[in-house]
Each structure stands twice: as C-alpha cells, then as structure tokens.
Amino acid sequence: MDRDRTTGWMEVICGSMFSGKTEELIRRLRRARIARQHTRVFKPALDERYSEDEVVSHNENSVTTTPVEAPPQIQELVQEADVVGIDEAQFFDDDLVPTCQALAEDGHRVIVVGLDTDYRAEPFDPMPQLMAVAEHVTKLHAVCVVCGAPANHSQRIVPGEDRVLVGATEAYEPRCRACFEPEPVTVTRPRPHTEALRAVATDDADASTNEADPEAADAASADGTAA
C-alpha cells in the first residue's frame, strides 16, 4: 500500500485481566474518531466471550471489530485506516510482530492490547516481542481481590492446564504478587467486594494512564464518552 504520510508507530497496552486494557483501547479509538481519523479494530476469531463482531470491555463498553484467524489477514483488511487497534494480542502467533511492524512502517498508528503474562505468570508470546519494538508501552494494573493491593497477575480459578482458556470473571481474578498462586485455585464463592474492586481497577487504570500521559488526560477531558 502506498500511503502519502510519514511513518506510523506502535503502542502496546498490557497488564493483567481486569486492569482496563480494552477500556483504554476504546478510549484511544474514540479520541482518534474525534480527530476524524479512520479506525479499524481486529481481534482473534477465538475470542467470542461477549460478541463475535465487537471488542467489549469487562464493563461492557464496546466498538465494532473484525475477527481474524491469523495476523496477515489484518494487512489485507486494514485498507486506508489511520489507526489500527488489535485486541487480545496474546492469542495470535508470532506473525503478529512483523505484521504490526509492517503496518507502522506503512504509516498506520497501531495500538496492540494484550496480557503480558499467562496464568502461570510467564511471558505470554508474542507480547514481549511487541513491547520490545513498540514506541510506547502502557502497563496497567488491576486491584487484587484478596488484599486490595495493585494486581499484576491473572489468577486462574478453574481447573485446567491449557495455556489458552478464554474466560472472564468465572475463570480468572486479579491478584498481586504476594497473593498470586502459579497453579489454578478453586474459588467456591464470590469474595467480598470483588465486583467493587474490579470497578476500582478500571478507574485506577484510567488514572494511572492519565498521570503517565498528560496528552491522554487532555483527551479524556475532551471526550465526554471516555471511561
């Protein structure tokens, strides 16, 4: 594709589950649309937790998306988008890295979102490689449902050793380093204030992003729909 513009760039938004990653992607996309930029959003076809054709945050904000089976399809479908969003990047294979590099070099702003570690707290490919080559990396934290500290781990609370287990509150909960257990644990009943802590996690994610990025804070003020 021959684009009459300067080289684009890559942004990575990472963190544990329930840290507000998808919410932050939606906020940045809304800001781009306010600036009259054309956006396209993609996600892995296997992610059907909330909708087949939308990216949906855990608090149910959403944007229309295109499910794809493999990263090269993104290059085929992106067309003239100024901003390309890619959610749940950890579910793609390593082809996502050269795909994102090519998109950025072709003039697109590429926003990649995903878990940086799996349920064993091990780096979740291809996220480490994407973080290494991105111009901007934002790491968000949830709130530990056990003690209330900042959480950077996704604790699996259902049986199973498969690395990929698509789920939400029924399968995972955010935990801090001290409360995290590398093996799945069984939670037989909801913890006190769990939903409140998850709501705070999203608020804290927005606040920490704005503190680190004054431009993002200005955008949040300008966009009345931002979370």
Swiss-Prot record:
The active site is at E88 (proton acceptor). It catalyses: thymidine + ATP = dTMP + ADP + H(+). One of its GO terms (biological process) is thymidine metabolic process. Pfam families: TK. Its EC number is 2.7.1.21. Keywords: ATP-binding, Cytoplasm, DNA synthesis, Kinase, Metal-binding, Nucleotide-binding, Transferase, Zinc. Residues 217-227 have a biased composition (Low complexity). GO terms for molecular function: ATP binding; thymidine kinase activity; zinc ion binding. It comes from the Bacteria. Residues 198-227 are annotated as: Disordered. SUPFAM superfamilies: Glucocorticoid receptor-like (DNA-binding domain), P-loop containing nucleoside triphosphate hydrolases. Zn(2+) binds at C144, C147, C176, C179. Homotetramer. PANTHER family: THYMIDINE KINASE (PTHR11441), THYMIDINE KINASE, CYTOSOLIC (PTHR11441:SF0). This is Thymidine kinase. It comes from Salinibacter ruber (strain DSM 13855 / M31).
